[in-house]
Amino acid sequence: MQAGKPILYSYFRSSCSWRVRIALALKGIDYKTVPINLIKDRGQQFSKDFQALNPMKQVPTLKIDGITIHQSLAIIEYLEEMRPTPRLLPQDPKKRASVRMISDLIAGGIQPLQNLSVLKQVGEEMQLTWAQNAITCGFNALEQILQSTAGIYCVGDEVTMADLCLVPQVANAERFKVDLTPYPTISSINKRLLVLEAFQVSHPCRQPDTPTELRA
């Protein structure tokens, strides 16, 4: 199959999509964005066309090299294997395990508990409290872990997959008005990452589907 420009099905505010956008930017991969609005039309992810593409009806979804990949960490790992520069997983097995541990903690242990589909089930009056509790519980653990793994970034002094997970999750925390004062390590790493070009161009405020009032 002829492989053209990669296509990323993404929602500007999706933290999972943001992880992949950062990876694509870091690796210098040119791609086309197809916006999937998770709110408009009762959720465009529920359309028959998108469900045929991704049976889980979630973003991100990436078409690349003639295949379709779902789930942000699986996408990033594929990009790492096929386009390994710059490296997002350390060569050292112990550091690589730390990167995967932190990535899984965020992608599997924090974000799913406060995502849109869960908050809809909680009920409007409880959404903010629920999200704050989920993020705070996860950040309590993450702050402690980072104190032993961090250098300039989450694991040592090079940007890794863990950092791609951290920044979008801090943005979620800020959106849900979580007090970040108890998390100085998380906050300082996040601040250092946000000045990097790949994190800026992939930011939710600079996407094709970003509403005008949220653009920067």
UniProtKB/Swiss-Prot annotation:
Keyword Phosphoprotein found = yes
Per UniProt, the keywords (alphabetical) are: Acetylation, Cytoplasm, Disease variant, Isomerase, Multifunctional enzyme, Phenylalanine catabolism, Phosphoprotein, Transferase, Tyrosine catabolism
* Cofactor(s) the protein requires to work: glutathione
Q: What does this protein do?
A: Bifunctional enzyme showing minimal glutathione-conjugating activity with ethacrynic acid and 7-chloro-4-nitrobenz-2-oxa-1,3-diazole and maleylacetoacetate isomerase activity. Also has low glutathione peroxidase activity with T-butyl and cumene hydroperoxides. Is able to catalyze the glutathione dependent oxygenation of dichloroacetic acid to glyoxylic acid.
Q: Which disease is it linked to?
A: Maleylacetoacetate isomerase deficiency: An autosomal recessive inborn error of metabolism characterized by mild elevations in succinylacetone in blood and urine, usually identified by newborn screening. Liver function and coagulation are normal. MAAID is a benign disorder.
Provide the GO biological process annotations: cellular detoxification; glutathione metabolic process; L-phenylalanine catabolic process; tyrosine catabolic process
Q: Name one Pfam family in it.
A: GST_N_2
Residues annotated as carrying N-acetylmethionine in the record are: M1
Species this chain originates from: Homo sapiens (Human)
| Keyword Acetylation annotated | yes
Q: What is its main location?
A: cytoplasm
Might you give the EC number(s) for this enzyme? 5.2.1.2, 2.5.1.18
- Which sites bind glutathione? S14, S15, C16, S17, W18, R19, Q45, V59, Q71, S72, Q111, N115, L116, S117
Family per similarity comment: Belongs to the GST superfamily. Zeta family.
The name this protein carries in UniProt is Maleylacetoacetate isomerase
